[in-house]
From Swiss-Prot:
One of its GO terms (molecular function) is xenobiotic transmembrane transporter activity. It is a multi-pass membrane protein. It is found in: Cell inner membrane. NCBIfam families: PRK10503.1, RND_permease_2. Residues 1032-1052 are annotated as: Disordered. This is Multidrug resistance protein MdtB.
Length: 1052
């Protein structure tokens, strides 16, 4: 058994210094755990901060927005409104579709929310229309979340209806089964159907009406149980030719007899194989296509989900005919991977820069290797904790590790520098390691816990911003904690074995030059410090000025929520006049697509028109524009958007709204622009008055561009005004009139064709091409009580009116959403203030409430908590420092350095044109933790000099400043160079990382210059105040040896 040497000291590091094998194995265990954790960690763009969101879609073809609202949306909303944990409920009722989006509290598991939604739908079933062709369908997906993958399916020799059928059964269903997939939508879906187009004059001439024909078709196509025959020895199942599965079979269907002669369906109608909804269309570039948009469930690993889909895609494509082409047009994971790879490169670059700084200061290869090992060990070990905490490798956690490179090396540098000082005095390396580590142990603990204290308030933040902060803060805190452990264990052990007097005194040309340079800097610093200490009030004035300037800059700097990212993907909405027809809208959509594809930065696009669960009105078209990689284009996304809008502005009668796709999606509805706020009222009439006024007012204000709203009440409505008395006299009911209209103009789904793999519909309508426009109403015939035909225009008049294209609700009340983008040079904070001002200027009534949505709402919450967050961080750090130093005064001296960091960070943000956003706030909070390190190192040594050497406070702080100048400069430069790659990043997602780097670099430069002078002056000021109030002896008793307290000893 090894005998422990009698060398005293070492503190908590003693055991590790004397047991090098155990220490090495302990570090190897941390390294292996980190490597295993890294390999198991998922990859994503950002921490998972999605609200549990479920979308409920109910289709009712032919129904007006009013009918959809009252008969479908309202009954469902009443049931959904009773669910616990519901945060927000938004609905959109348009012609033929009801879409309800349910957003739940962050704490509610998505599976629990799903169960509640299913129960609510079941409870509302009896209240829904009896002729509803499809039941409500819910999907665990946020409709505002852009698809993770977009596939375009085109064909040359096969009808698109047949292609759609194959894609739905062979591809879409299989992809929907992949873990993490929330919804697969088929835009432009030409789902096969048998279309029956009635010839109204022929129907009237034969004395028939559409209801008779509908009933005949429904009765002729059935698929029901028929039973079986069970004899003495055999059992026989009954079957029949009760189904008709093709247009040819329907043509010969006998629907009535006249004078003994059969009337077949083909006598009064055109029957064809067509699409279930012929008012849907999609294109890949300019070619007709079926577009598959694959959306993820909230909270899943997007990379793993996309990889699973891509792995199975080749096998799925093999099941399709060779003439069918499937292309992946959009893959959001490619930019996520590129962004993460860029951050990983910046992390390695930061490590290299930090090692370079260490070598320049230590001027010794052996001394450089020791902290160089501490950096990767601390970072890799963090991955193990991240795995057990359920984190992912994402931009924020990698940014935390990049910043940590400058933090984790600090502790090792302080330990090495202190041990080296004793070795250079001639002590043996082992004795120097024990003495130096024991002496510096309390400082390391102070630095670590005070820095972690800064991050504690971040853990208590709620909502989206809190989730974002939490993963960043915990990752950084773990890295710092592991760094402290490494610095108190591995670092002094390696110093004892690798450093020697000869190696430290050995010099080369670089070391001699740097030695002279640092001696010159310290000499000039000593002269400047003397002057500053002799003119304390001037220095205090400067310190106070930095505090005032920090407040002024905070008030002046533009404020935002999240940096605008260039992910190479743009979402677009094309808006046409509200009365536009489907064919006209499709033509305009293709015209715009052709213009966009000419732009040199555009690689491809998909576009879609029609009404379904993703698009509420016919006058809106959707676009998804894929840009070329950053390396292949000259401009960033804001410039490209401006250029595209200018190019399209020459197309008459349309307005194009564009917004870049972001990794962070908080909204629950797909909007035309980036930012939204909602107006709520008790009636639609109030909204119709005030929404246009507010939109018009905002359009005049400077911070806004692309101001619009989803309030559309100028759609053309053909109002059928029935003379009820005349209809009753003829034995015609309102139900019969509604049925006749629905049969003629509603693309009514009247029967179902069942096959082994799918179900198809029979669609009934009038052949409107024969009699276009309102004249088609003249062909409508009904059957009176005497069996004779009655023209609809004999009992009703047709009036053309204006009406809503869609009716929106927010939490069951009528609502309208106003959307806007920011004008060049304006911040989100300025826009929010301008909205509030506009409401006052137009004198918006009190019974109309406004509420910001999505990222704008999150911005308000973040802005409101920013100041309190910084105050909480300062208070937490004061408490920790007060406990460690057993003093009320010294923590104030240390915290006096903070305004210098704030000034530097805010100035840097303003000079580089960045806003004060969530990422910048993280940087400022981290600066609070970094900058106080300078003061801690000064004050620790000053207190020790006063206590152990009997120095005066003046001499003690003066010597502490000179003695700790090099480690202070070294640790500051290490942190600065650790942040430098983030500030200078240019790759994918650089917009997200730059504000953090700018804050860190700017704050460190300014604080480094100022705190070297302000801290000693403030130290002497508080020392003088303490002596004047309590007396000299009492003051000396209060300066307790903190390291003795830590070891359980009584103070001397």
């Amino acid at each position: 058994m090894q005998v422990m040497p009698p060398t005293p000291g070492g503190g908590p590091s003693r055991l590790f210094i004397l047991r090098p094998v155990a220490t090495t194995l302990f570090m190897i265990a941390i390294l292996l755990a980190g490597i295993i954790g890294y390999r198991a960690l998922p990859v994503s763009a950002l921490p998972e901060v999605d609200y549990p969101t479920i979308q409920v879609v109910t289709l009712y073809p032919g129904a007006s927005p009013d009918v959809v609202t009252s008969s479908i949306t309202a009954p469902l909303e009443r049931q959904f409104g009773q669910m616990s944990g519901l945060k927000q409920m938004a609905s959109q009722s348009s012609g033929g579709a009801s879409v309800i989006t349910l957003q739940f509290q962050l704490t509610l598991p998505l599976d629990v929310a799903e169960q509640e939604v299913q129960a609510a739908i079941n409870a509302a079933t009896n209240l829904l229309p009896s002729d509803l062709p499809y039941p409500p369908i819910y999907n665990k997906v946020n409709p505002a979340d852009p698809p993770i993958l977009t596939l375009a399916v085109t064909a040359t020799a096969i009808p698109m209806t047949q292609v759609e059928d194959m894609v739905e059964t062979r591809i879409a269903q299989k992809i929907s089964q992949v873990t993490g997939v929330g919804l697969v939508t088929l835009s432009g879906g030409q789902r096969p159907a048998v279309r029956v187009k009635l010839n109204a004059p022929a129907v009237a001439a034969l004395g028939l009406d559409s209801e008779t024909i509908r009933t005949a078709i429904s009765n002729a196509n059935v698929n029901s149980a028929k039973g079986s025959l069970d004899g003495p020895t055999r059992s026989v199942t009954l079957s029949a030719n009760d189904q008709m599965k093709s247009a040819e079979e329907y043509r010969d269907l006998i629907i009535a007899y006249q004078n003994g002669a059969p009337i077949r369906l083909q006598d009064v109608a055109t029957i064809e194989q067509g699409a279930e909804n012929n008012k849907l269309a999609a294109w890949a570039n300019t070619q007709s296509a079926i577009v598959l948009n694959i959306q993820r469930q909230p909270g899943v690993n997007v990379i793993a989900t996309a990889d699973s889909i891509r792995e199975m895609l080749p096998e799925l494509i093999k099941s399709l005919p060779k003439s069918v082409d499937v292309k992946v047009l959009t893959d959001r994971t490619s930019t996520i991977r590129a962004s993460v790879n860029d951050v990983q490169f910046e992390l390695l670059l930061a490590i290299a820069l930090v090692v370079m700084v260490i070598y320049l200061f230590l001027r010794n290869a052996a001394a450089t290797i020791i902290p160089s090992i501490a950096v990767p060990l601390s970072l890799v070990g963090t991955f193990a904790a991240m795995y057990f905490l359920g984190f992912s490798i994402n931009n924020l956690t990698l940014m935390a590790l990049t910043i940590a490179t400058g933090f984790v090396v600090d502790d090792a540098i302080v330990v090495i520098e202190n041990i080296s000082r004793y070795i250079e005095k001639g002590e043996k390396p082992l004795d120097a390691a024990l003495k130096g580590a024991g002496e510096i142990g309390f400082t390391i603990i102070s630095l670590t816990f005070s820095l972690i204290a800064v991050l504690i308030p971040l853990l208590f933040m709620e909502d989206i911003v809190g989730r974002l902060f939490r993963e960043f803060a915990v990752t950084l805190a773990v890295a710092i904690l592991i760094s402290a452990v490494v610095s108190l264990t591995l670092t002094p052990m390696m110093c004892a074995r690798m450093l020697s007097y000869e190696s430290l005194r050995k010099q080369n040309r670089l070391s001699r030059a740097s030695e002279k340079f640092f001696d010159w800097v310290i000499a000039h610093y000593a002269v400047a410090l003397k002057k500053v200490l002799n003119h304390p009030w001037l220095t205090l004035s400067v310190a106070f000025s930095t505090l005032v300037l920090t407040v002024i800059l905070y008030l002046l700097i533009p404020k935002g929520f999240f940096p605008l990212q260039d992910n190479g993907l743009i979402q677009g909405t094309l808006e046409a006049p509200q009365s536009v027809s489907f064919s006209n809208m499709a033509e305009r959509q293709q015209q715009v697509a052709a213009i966009i594809l000419k732009d040199p930065a555009v690689e491809s696009l998909t576009s879609f028109v029609g009404v379904d669960g993703t698009n509420a009105t016919l006058n809106n078209g959707r676009l998804q524009i894929n840009l070329k990689p950053l390396s292949e284009r000259d401009d960033r996304i804001p410039q490209i958007i401006t250029r595209l809008q200018e190019s399209v502005s020459g197309v008459p009668g349309i307005k194009l709204y564009l917004q870049p796709v972001q990794d962070l999606t908080i909204d629950t509805q797909l909007s035309r622009t980036q930012y939204q706020f909602t107006l709520q009222a008790t009636s639609l009439e109030e909204l119709s008055t005030w929404v246009p006024k507010l939109v018009n007012e905002l359009q005049q204000k400077a911070p806004f561009q692309d101001v619009t709203s989803d309030w559309q009440d100028q759609g053309l409505v053909a109002f059928v005004n029935v003379d009820r008395d005349s209809a009753s006299r003829l034995g015609i009911t309102m139900a019969a009139i509604d049925n006749a209209l629905y049969n003629a103009f509603g693309q009514r789904l009247i029967s179902t064709i069942y096959t082994q793999s799918n179900q198809y519909r029979v669609v009934l309508e009038h052949d409107v091409q024969a009699t276009p426009g309102l004249a088609a109403f003249n062909d409508i015939r009904l059957t009176g009580s005497d069996g004779k035909g009655v023209p609809l225009n004999s009992i009703a008049t047709i009036e053309e009116r204006f009406g809503p294209l869609s009716i929106n609700h927010l939490n069951q009340f009528p609502s309208a959403t106003v959307s806007f983008n920011l004008a060049q040079g304006y911040s989100l904070g300025e826009a929010v203030a301008a909205v509030t001002l506009a409401e006052k200027e137009i004198q918006l009534p009190a019974d109309i409430t406004t509420r910001f949505q999505g990222s704008t709402l999150a911005f308000q919450a973040a802005l409101g908590s920013t100041l309190w967050l910084i105050i909480a961080a300062i208070v937490a750090m004061y408490i920790v420092l007060g406990v460690l130093y057993e003093s009320f005064i010294h923590p104030i001296t240390i915290l006096s350095t903070l305004p210098t960091a704030g000034v530097g960070a805010l100035l840097a943000l303003m000079l580089t044109g960045n806003e004060l956003d969530v990422i910048a706030i993280i940087g400022i909070i981290l600066l609070i933790g970094i900058v106080k390190k300078n003061a801690i190192m000064m004050i620790d040594f000053a207190l020790a000099a006063e206590r152990d050497q009997g120095m005066t406070p003046y001499d003690a702080i003066y010597q502490a400043c000179l003695l700790r100048f090099r480690p202070i400069l070294m640790t500051t430069l290490a942190a600065l160079f650790g942040a430098l790659p983030l500030m200078l990043s240019t790759g994918v997602g650089a917009e997200l990382r730059q504000p953090l780097g700018v804050c860190m670099v700017g704050g460190l430069i300014v604080s480094q210059v100022l705190t070297l002078f302000t801290t000693p002056v403030i130290y002497l000021l508080f020392d003088k105040l303490a002596r004047n109030t309590r007396g000299k002896n009492r003051h000396r008793d209060e300066d307790i040896d903190s390291s003795e307290l830590l070891n359980g000893q009584e103070p001397q």
